[in-house]
Amino acid sequence: MTYSARSIIEPNRTLEIVVEANVTERKPHRAVVEMPFSFPFRDKAVQTHIKGFDIHEMLGTKMRAMFQRKRGRDLFDLYWALTKSPTPVDPAAIIASFEHYLKQEGTKAGRAEFIGILDNHLKDRGFCSDMQPLLRTDIAYDPQAAGKYVKAHLLNLLPA
């Protein structure tokens, strides 16, 4: 599914946001969690709980995506979750979910291989620039610094 929206930064540019879903995975690795959710409605704050996937599972599948494709948003999402998320994340739990999904596919990923893939991604101008038009102007993001951080705090936990 693709959404189109006008760029705020470049008024004559249309941005396309592709929403992807993996429909072959039917059962989550971790238990579904309930999360508080609130939104304004008619000058009141409505509060409820919604069910969703555990953050570590979502980041594990995001990590798998970065391993299997070249999209800068995957690095951004991992970096942002590790550094800015209001929900604390445990890098070891992310790795466990990542390895679970690779095992289901019959695939393995060692530390050196994944770091090599990320290093190659970071040499690609498109990979390093695809998030910029989507970010608010007050958000500073450096893909090279993000890559260094993700390697040190996440990928270094992978088996050798």
List the predicted regions and their residue ranges.
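Structured mid-to-C-terminal alpha-helical surface segments
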Residues: 1-160
